């Protein structure tokens, strides 16, 4: 069975590169993005892509539920990369 990882902040930069790299290494990657259009783009690349926006707690809960439902309640790794490039 493939190992699973949830990576936040996959719209661009480090998160996007990490998602592609982990997929290339055989992991099942849940590539979370803040905007629906980015999730759609990631899905077109073959990723599972939950919508998770750290400023909207309901998306965090829904996104995590989506991931845990898809994996049977387990996750091997988390890379909390989201919003590292945002000021504030």
Q: What do the PLM-derived regions correspond to, one by one?
A:
Residues 25-40:
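Conserved glycine-rich Rossmann-like NAD(P)H-binding loop of the short-chain dehydrogenase/reductase
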Residues 11-12:
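Conserved glycine-rich cofactor-binding loop
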Residues 8, 75-83:
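Rossmann-fold scaffold of SDR-type NAD(P)-dependent oxidoreductases
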Residues 15-16:
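N-terminal Rossmann-fold NAD(P) dinucleotide-binding loop
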Residues 22:
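Aromatic pocket-lining residues of Rossmann-like dinucleotide-binding sites
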Residues 85-88:
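Conserved mid-core segment of classical short-chain dehydrogenase/reductases
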Residues 45-58:
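Rossmann-fold cofactor-recognition segment
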Residues 55-70:
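Conserved Rossmann-fold cofactor-binding substructure of NAD(P)-dependent oxidoreductases
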């Amino acid at each position: 069975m493939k190992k699973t990882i949830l990576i936040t902040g996959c719209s661009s930069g480090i998160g996007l590169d990490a998602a592609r790299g982990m997929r290339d290494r055989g992991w099942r990657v849940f590539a979370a993005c803040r905007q629906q259009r980015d999730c759609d783009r990631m899905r077109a690349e073959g990723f599972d892509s939950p919508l998770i926006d750290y400023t909207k707690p309901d998306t965090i809960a829904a996104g995590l539920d989506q991931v845990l439902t898809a994996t049977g309640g387990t996750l091997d790794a988390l890379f909390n990369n989201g919003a590292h490039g945002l000021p504030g």
